[in-house]
A protein has these predicted regions:
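Short hydrophobic transmembrane-like helices used for membrane targeting/insertion
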Residues: 1-3, 18
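Basic polycationic patches enriched in arginine
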Residues: 4, 10-12
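Active-site beta-strand->loop->alpha-helix modules in alpha/beta enzyme cores, enriched
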Residues: 12, 16-204, 239-246, 258-269, ...
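A short acidic, often aromatic-flanked loop/helix-cap motif at beta-alpha or helix-coil junctions
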Residues: 148-152, 210-213, 234-236
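Short, flexible loop segments at boundaries between secondary-structure elements
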Residues: 199-219
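A conserved mid-domain beta-alpha-beta active-site/ligand-binding segment of alpha/beta enzyme cores
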Residues: 214-250
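Acidic two-metal-ion nuclease catalytic site recognized across multiple nuclease folds
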Residues: 278-280
Length: 280
């Protein structure tokens, strides 16, 4: 079945692919990747030769025959921001794929009377299911239902849960352990613990780091990094999967907050590749 964007999605298509504005705020020492506007522009990242020189890897190398891809997403939408293109390629090739949603993303609109935690608990998992269908994955995410915004206090509990869910033939993808978001980092630590104990392989993926890091930033493990090229179908499916997260794409009329997935985040999601940090 062909994937058709909703009218609002068509209006966002141009914004999804425009070049980043020259006036974007540069990352600084005090930059908060979550609450501060702007970040390192996509123009700056595109101008860095190191990004295009990363070793290339294909889906079959990342997830060899006889293994299963497991994506551990701290919040609904992280699975697509991390590896939406990879998931589309794996689904098309018939690979085994499983997504674990650590939280229901109920803390994305703090202080909002429009997007309350109760409403988000209903909406965001539904958005995630729709997004996975766009990628060709029919099995819904397994919801672990931990508390959004408090995973740093729950990473031991999360690690234990993951140990019961993964095995030695799994390739586990999750957010980078120094991504700048406490939930992302706690999830990565839990995944690192669980994969060591279960002898599974771990691949970490930066999400918020693109905001605060600079091209060539020595704080990122570039020596371990690789790049997964995305074909046209994977890019298209990833775009429509992002559009499923309407709660994250709209400004909050109650608080005046801008969309969680702002223009810079969307531009990064439109890249023809995904950058990954396989654990060494």
């Amino acid at each position: 079945m062909g994937i058709r964007p909703a009218p609002a999605s068509r209006q966002r298509l141009e914004a999804f692919s425009i070049a980043a504005p020259n006036a974007c705020m540069k990352a600084a020492n005090a930059f908060d990747p979550i609450t501060s506007p702007g970040g390192t522009s996509e123009e700056d990242w595109n101008g860095w030769p190191g990004l295009t020189r990363l070793p290339r890897v294909d889906a079959e190398t990342l997830v060899p025959a006889g293994t299963r891809a497991v994506v551990v997403a701290p919040h609904p939408d992280d699975e697509v921001l991390m590896v939406g293109g990879l998931l589309a390629q794996l689904a098309r090739k018939g690979f085994l794929v499983r997504v674990f949603a650590v939280t229901d993303g109920t803390a994305s609109h703090r202080g909002s009377s429009a997007w309350t935690p109760r409403l988000l608990r209903q909406v965001r998992p539904r958005e995630s299911r729709a997004a996975l269908r766009c990628l060709g994955i029919t099995e819904p995410p397994l919801r672990l239902k931990l508390q959004d915004g408090a995973l740093s206090k729950q990473h031991g509990r999360l690690a234990e849960r993951l140990c019961s869910l993964i095995g030695p033939h799994d390739i586990v993808f999750t957010t980078w352990r120094r991504d700048g978001n406490p939930d992302h980092e706690a999830t990565a630590r839990a995944c690192a613990s669980a994969t060591r104990r279960r002898r599974a392989r771990l691949v970490e993926v930066p999400v918020w780091a693109w905001n605060w890091a600079q091209p060539g930033d020595p704080r990122l493990p570039w020596r371990n990094a690789c790049s997964l090229p995305l074909d046209a179908d994977a890019k298209r499916r990833k775009f429509f999967a992002i559009q499923a997260y309407e709660s994250q794409l709209l400004p909050d009329e109650c608080t005046g907050a801008q969309p969680v997935l702002d223009a810079l985040m969307l531009q990064r999601a439109a890249r023809p590749f995904e950058v990954l940090f396989p654990a060494q």
